[in-house]
Curated annotation (Swiss-Prot):
It is found in: Early endosome. Residues 229-459, 510-579 form a coiled coil. InterPro entries: CCDC93 (IPR039116), CCDC93_CC (IPR019159), CCDC93_N (IPR048747). This is Coiled-coil domain-containing protein 93. May be involved in copper-dependent atp7a trafficking between the trans-Golgi network and vesicles in the cell periphery. Belongs to the CCDC93 family. One of its GO terms (biological process) is protein transport. One of its GO terms (cellular component) is early endosome. PANTHER family: COILED-COIL DOMAIN-CONTAINING PROTEIN 93, FIDIPIDINE. The gene is ccdc93. Keywords: Coiled coil, Endosome, Protein transport, Transport.
Length: 609
């Protein structure tokens, strides 16, 4: 802050790629329906964070923020807000990673894929909700209201159904006759069919094709001139036989009442009580047996229609079997398809995990490239040394185990030999001493290894304590923001103090003026009473006016001094600005010369053999 309370301008460098990404983010948010991003008075942080919060809320996820009345928040509020947003993203299964400092630092390159995914998810959720609300509205409308066409259709449908049921009831088959109990049983199938049809009032005669031919009729040829007469005669004979046959059947029947022949409710209940599968099986078996019996008893009556019915029945049976097989295959196909979907889902999860690992690897490589090479090399040497020591320890332990097993075998063998020769005590003491020495040596090596591990851990902590370039840049940005806020607050406070002092001085002068006017008003009548008092009053007024003039001259002099001081400070400020411009220009030229020097050095190195 300068002596005049003004905030110095800090040079900021806007990255072109960041600006492009910010423009793309704002275009995405406006296209998705977040029109608050068009307001020019808002900061990029408020636009981006507001758009992210709007997308998250649109996707039916809760986030504890309030952006309606807290624009241009402080750093603490921004940090809390970004942490809440980042904590919600994993719940939404966002495939992109984002940190709070990236949002707060306006890293639009990393924010853009998250915004893109959120906008896509918000549009999909809005479409789903639109379809759901539309279908719900239609269903509610259909429950409460109906169109004239629907009402007319319902009326016509009820009328048509009622007419159809009445027609079916009127024209349904009714049993008019019934065979008597003592009548003879019909043996052939054709007679049974005719008898059943006659019970329902239907009379059918034998056709010409259904009449069985006699062997003698097939052998004797008929002359061409007598063909017509023979056919007429045969038809008359058939008709007469049919009439006799019907009369014979009708003599065995008796007329039925309207309610006879109907099944009672108990009989229907007993029939329905049977299992449907058993009924179907019994019906199919009965049909097969009946067809076999009829084929065996009277093969001459099997015509083309009956053979066609048998083929149709067999084909229907095959169709049923194939349908069952098709259902089984469809179930297997659905199971395979579900397995394929699960495999694809696992594949996408694995690929996303692999991409995350690759991104983490790239971040680690960037951090490694920005770190100090000497410290990294030292750390690599220590890690390699640690690994070599661990390997040596493992090898030494394995050797010690082998040696211990070998020595144990020697001890056992020596014990066995010592029992024979009487030298067990001396050899056991020697082995004990050797074992203690090896044990002490192993303990020393372990202590050295622990010391090295502690040193490596201390170095790890020291390296972790050193901030990276990105963290330093973040700290610098935060300090600049804090400095700007402190300077703005200081400037505002200084203005308040100056205003207070000015108003206080004005108040003092106004009080003096009021007191003077009151005293003049109080003493004016007495002073005008006598000439001597009037002269004294006038002299006092002249003295007061002279004092006011002197005070005014002092204030004018002080004003001129402050004005001169201001002009002097302004000149110094302009000189400092000129020096600053010259400094930035010199730094820029120096960087350009350094770059040219580096290019020339690389060219010279490339030309030298």
């Amino acid at each position: 802050m300068t002596a005049r309370g003004e905030t110095p301008e800090v040079e900021t460098r806007e990255d072109e790629e960041q600006s492009v990404k910010l423009a793309e983010i704002l275009e995405l948010l406006v296209a998705a329906g977040y029109f608050r991003a068009r307001i020019k008075g808002l900061s990029p942080f408020d636009k981006v964070v507001g758009g992210m919060t709007w997308c998250i809320t649109t996707c039916n996820f809760d986030i504890d923020v309030d952006l309606l009345f807290q624009e241009n928040s402080t750093i603490g509020q921004k940090i809390a807000l970004t942490e809440k947003i980042v904590s919600v993203l994993p719940k939404m299964k966002c495939p992109h990673r984002l940190e709070p400092h990236q949002i707060q630092g306006l890293d639009f390159i990393h924010i853009f894929p998250v915004i893109q995914w959120l906008v896509k998810r918000a549009i999909e959720t809005r479409q789903e909700m639109g379809d759901y609300i539309r279908s719900y509205s239609v269903s509610q409308f259909q429950k409460e209201h109906s169109l004239p066409e629907d009402q007319e259709f319902e009326h016509r449908r009820e009328k048509a159904v009622r007419t159809l049921s009445e027609t079916l009831d009127v024209y349904r088959p009714r049993r008019k006759y019934k065979r008597q109990g003592g009548s003879a049983e019909l043996m052939d199938e054709e007679s049974r069919v005719h008898s059943t049809l006659l019970e329902y009032g239907r009379r059918y005669g034998l056709s010409k094709q259904m009449k069985p031919e006699k062997p003698e009729d097939r052998k004797v040829p008929v002359p061409q001139g007598l063909v017509g007469k023979g056919e007429v005669k045969e038809e008359e004979e058939l008709r007469a036989e049919e009439e006799l046959r019907i009369k014979a059947l009708m003599t065995e029947m008796a007329a039925m009442g309207m309610e006879e022949g109907r099944l009672t409710a108990s009989t229907v209940g007993q029939i329905v009580g049977l299992q449907s599968d058993e009924i179907k099986q019994m019906v199919s078996e009965y049909a097969e047996k009946q067809s076999e019996l009829s084929a065996e008893d009277r093969p001459e009556y099997l015509g083309a229609a009956q053979q066609h019915r048998r083929k149709v029945a067999s084909l229907n049976k095959q169709i049923g079997q194939r349908k069952k097989l098709l259902d089984q295959l469809q179930e297997k196909a659905s199971e395979l398809q579900s397995g394929s979907c699960e495999a694809k889902k696992q594949l996408t999860e694995v690929t996303s995990h692999m991409e995350n690992l690759e991104q983490e690897l790239l971040v680690l490589e960037k951090v490694e490239s920005k770190a100090d090479p000497s410290v990294l090399q030292k750390l690599r040497d220590l890690v390699a040394q640690n690994e070599s020591l661990k390997l040596q320890e493992q090898q030494f332990r394995s050797k010690c185990r082998e040696e211990m097993s070998r020595l144990q075998q020697n001890i056992d063998s020596l014990k066995a030999a010592a029992t024979e020769h009487g030298e067990e005590k001396e050899q056991s003491q020697a082995f004990e001493q050797q074992y203690k020495a090896e044990k002490e040596k192993l303990q020393k090596i372990r202590l050295l290894l622990a010391r090295r591990n502690r040193e490596i851990a201390i170095l790890h902590r020291k390296i972790d304590e050193v901030p990276s370039r990105a963290e330093l840049t973040q700290y610098q940005k935060r300090f600049i923001e804090l400095y700007g806020q402190v300077s703005a607050t200081h400037k505002e406070t200084k203005q308040f103090f100056t205003l207070y002092n000015t108003l206080d001085d004005k108040k003092v002068y106004l009080e003096k003026e009021v007191n003077l006017l009151n005293s003049v008003h109080d003493n004016f009548q007495q002073a005008m009473a006598s000439p001597s008092v009037r002269d004294q009053f006038l002299r006092q007024m002249e003295q007061i006016v002279d004092g006011i003039r002197q005070s005014r001259n002092k204030m004018e002099k002080k004003k001129q001094e402050n004005k001169m001081k201001r002009d002097q400070l302004n000149d110094e400020y302009l000189e400092l600005l000129e020096k600053q411009r010259l400094y930035f220009k010199t730094v820029k030229e120096f960087r350009e010369e350094c770059r040219r020097n580096e290019t020339l050095l690389t060219k010279m190195k490339g030309q030298t053999p």
